[in-house]
């Protein structure tokens, strides 16, 4: 099955999406038993066929396990440091340091639930977070993973959270009173907002090579090296 997924063109695959799967625990589970026996075999097969392991929605121990088990560096394609904003989807310093040591990539997210002050997060705060992340992980291993759901109706996020796995409503990162897609910060409403990030990073001292790396070149280099 993993080979078939690769043959269809997929080059990244998550082991879990918020909930427990046959492969690993999701970040919303109360108990995180790590990568399962089947998960270990799937990681091995992903390494063989050239699919990058993505642990963006997975729990702490499961993510650390995946970093340790995978022969190739893994990616956390869309998340931020938990130390900056305490969202269950964001990642601990321990994970970021392990990711650094293994050569993995993180894509920093602009999804409001992952941002300090949500929709009201400022570009200055976001760029300071980028600088703080660069103290934990090599700057060449930092990219953007916007998690931008542009133009999607709220029915999409409702299906994503519930799918067919339960009759009761699960609001995930939202709440009963805030169940819809959150409004994006005004500095990143679509891809044109990357220019605002470029300007913000320049203002706090990043040079042109570092900025271009964060905004795309680092992911490009990762693709060239690890996607076959």
Predicted regions span which residues?
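Extended, charged catalytic domains and RNA/DNA-binding interfaces, predominantly
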Residues: 1-119, 127-136, 141, 162-171, ...
């Amino acid at each position: 099955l993993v080979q078939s997924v690769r043959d269809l063109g997929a080059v990244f695959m998550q082991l879990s999406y918020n909930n427990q799967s046959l492969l690993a625990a999701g970040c919303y589970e109360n108990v995180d038993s790590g990568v399962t026996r089947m998960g270990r075999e799937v990681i091995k097969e992903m390494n063989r066929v050239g699919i990058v392991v993505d642990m963006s929605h997975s729990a702490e121990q499961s993510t650390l396990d995946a970093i340790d088990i995978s022969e190739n560096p893994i990616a956390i394609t869309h998340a931020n440091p938990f130390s900056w904003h305490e969202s269950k989807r964001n990642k601990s310093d321990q994970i970021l340091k392990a990711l650094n040591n293994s050569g993995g990539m993180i894509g920093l997210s602009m999804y409001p639930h992952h941002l300090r002050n949500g929709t009201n997060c400022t570009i200055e705060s976001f760029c300071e977070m980028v600088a703080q992340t660069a103290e934990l992980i090599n700057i060449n291993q930092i990219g953007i993973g916007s998690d931008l759901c542009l133009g999607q109706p709220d029915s999409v996020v409702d299906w994503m959270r519930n799918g067919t796995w339960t009759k009761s409503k699960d609001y995930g990162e939202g709440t009963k009173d805030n169940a819809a897609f959150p409004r994006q910060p005004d500095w990143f409403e679509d891809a044109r907002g990357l220019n605002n990030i470029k300007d913000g990073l320049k203002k706090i001292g990043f040079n042109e090579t570092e900025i271009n790396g964060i905004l795309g070149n680092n992911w490009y280099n990762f693709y060239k090296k690890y996607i076959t």
